[in-house]
Structures are given as structure tokens and as C-alpha cells.
Amino acid sequence: MASLEDGTYRLRAVTTSNPDPGVGGEYATVEGARQPVKAEPSTPPFFERQIWQVTRNSDGQSTIKYQGLNAPFEYGFSYDQLEQNAPVIAGDPKEYILQLVPSTTDVYIIRAPIQRVGVDVEVGVQGNNLVYKFFPVDGSGGDRPAWRFTRE
């Protein structure tokens, strides 16, 4: 399985069944420290708050950190709790597993490396918030949220 190279990216919300939906879309957007990460269009005033640094760690997991201008301290994809539909928070960066979606080169499922009996915990969108979604580990459960990583 190909791994994502370290670098700066914009993260567009897509799905495993439709990894290339065409023009437009919503992108992971920081609102501020300790605030939920939003899904917003890639237009002003959101555009400058959609740049993320992805760094792969020695254990094969990755951190996704906000790379915007004038950030007073380091924050990235994080969580207070990993419950169904709990928001992704811009906080102390946590580690995630990035799983390449088959038949794509730049679309990944973002999975929290947390052991839950029978489920994978994945980053998706509900309304305009990034949230944690639970899916059966056996691959059932239908279409899954995924993210197109576009290099900056």
C-alpha cells in the first residue's frame, strides 16, 4: 500500500465510492485552537485556513497539523473523545492511520488508531463539521468518508 509523502496539503472531503466528484467541494478548515475543524469551500475567507502539514512518524502513523500563517502554537487534527459523531478538534495533534483508497493515488481514509471492538473510527463530515464515524471492521457499512490530499 502506498503511503502519503510528508508535505503540505489541502484535504477535500470525498467518499470511497466517488473519490473524484469534480469541481467544488468542501475542505478541512481550521477555525481556531480548541475549535471543531470545519468543512468549507475553497474560497475566501476559508482558503488560507485549509493548509495542513502531514508528517509520517516512525510507527507509520501520521499527524495532520495546521500550517497556516501566524499560528501562535502548533495544533492539528485531535479529539477530546472518540464517540460516534464527536467533532475533530484543532488541538494537540494526534496520530492517524492514512489508508489509500484502492484505484486512487491521492485519496485516503483517515482512521484514528484506537482499538474499538468491531469498528474502525474514521474522519468524515456531518453538516459542515469534521466528525468521527464508526464503521464495521469487516468492510461492510457502505460508502465511507475519504479525503483527497492535494499538494500545495
From Swiss-Prot:
Listed transmembrane segments: none
One Pfam family recorded for the sequence: Inhibitor_I48
Q: Which UniProt keywords apply?
A: Protease inhibitor, Thiol protease inhibitor
InterPro entries xref list: Prot_inh_I48_clitocypin (IPR019508)
> GO molecular function, one example?
cysteine-type endopeptidase inhibitor activity
Family designation: Belongs to the protease inhibitor I48 family.
Q: How does it assemble?
A: Homodimer.
Q: What does this protein do?
A: Binds and inhibits cysteine proteinases. Inhibits most strongly papain and cathepsin L, more weakly bromelain and cathepsin B while it is completely ineffective against cathepsin H.
Q: What is this protein called?
A: Clitocypin-5
Organism name: Clitocybe nebularis (Clouded agaric)
Taxon lineage: Eukaryota, Fungi, Dikarya, Basidiomycota, Agaricomycotina
